[in-house]
């Protein structure tokens, strides 16, 4: 039935989510649009390069956004790449290695939005009802993607990696695979501004 949408049969995580007894207080930061991001992926060819994160941060700079960087301890080197290229970004909160796998679904549920490539955390975000921005790069989003409230950003001409035909090397560099246009950055900003939690943050700031 082509009339059905993701809202007719939403996916969900097993509830109640495991809530840690203690957790980083910054997850409760008030008056901010909390955006979770994954800067790396198991398949390193799916890792979004630093320049793309900088472009996203710059486009959202006039909004009260905080970027929460999730990841396993061995992903710190990717955060170091961003720091080497652009210095310490003031609204990037490094949670790499600080959230256990058991605590991850609940922690991601605290986000207002999640931005990443086709990696595990976008599916966790989707399962806990967090809107997703998928930077699909070389991955076929027609075949597999989060199915909830999702914004797709990328170029279909770059699609060449599939569920049963995964590739680890590509003729294009990652900067080309994940390139974002001005139009797609505008769509991203519009998507963020349309989130109910974002509107509350704007109201709190008097915007």
Model-identified regions with their sequence ranges:
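Nucleotide-sugar donor-binding patch of glycosyltransferase catalytic domains
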Residues: 94, 126-206
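Short, glycine/serine-rich, charged loops/turns that create anion-binding
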Residues: 41-43, 74, 139-140
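Glycine/Thr-rich phosphate-binding loops of Rossmann-like dinucleotide-binding domains
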Residues: 45, 77, 124, 142-143
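Donor-binding and catalytic core of enzymes assembling or modifying cell-surface/extracellular glycoconjugates
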Residues: 52-137
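A short acidic, often aromatic-flanked loop/helix-cap motif at beta-alpha or helix-coil junctions
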Residues: 20-21, 100-104, 157-163
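Mid-sequence helix-capping/hinge segment at a functional interface
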Residues: 1-46, 50, 198-206
């Amino acid at each position: 039935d082509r009339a059905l949408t993701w809202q007719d049969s939403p996916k969900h995580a097993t509830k109640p989510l495991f809530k840690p007894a203690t957790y980083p207080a910054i997850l409760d930061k008030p008056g901010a649009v909390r955006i979770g991001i994954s800067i790396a992926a198991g398949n390193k060819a799916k890792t979004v390069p630093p320049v793309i994160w900088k472009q996203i941060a710059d486009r959202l700079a006039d909004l009260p956004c905080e970027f929460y960087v999730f990841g396993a301890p061995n992903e710190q080197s990717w955060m170091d790449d961003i720091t080497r290229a652009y210095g310490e970004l003031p609204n990037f909160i490094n949670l790499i290695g600080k959230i256990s796998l058991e605590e991850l679904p609940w922690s991601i549920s605290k986000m207002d939005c999640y931005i990443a490539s086709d990696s595990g955390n976008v599916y966790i975000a989707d399962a806990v009802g967090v809107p997703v921005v998928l930077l699909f790069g070389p991955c076929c989003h027609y075949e597999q993607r989060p199915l909830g409230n999702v914004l797709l950003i990328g170029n279909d001409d770059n699609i060449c990696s599939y569920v049963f035909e995964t590739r680890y090397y590509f003729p294009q560099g990652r900067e080309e695979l994940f390139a974002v246009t001005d139009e797609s950055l505008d769509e991203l900003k519009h998507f963020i501004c349309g989130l109910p939690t974002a509107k509350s943050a704007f109201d709190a700031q008097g915007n």
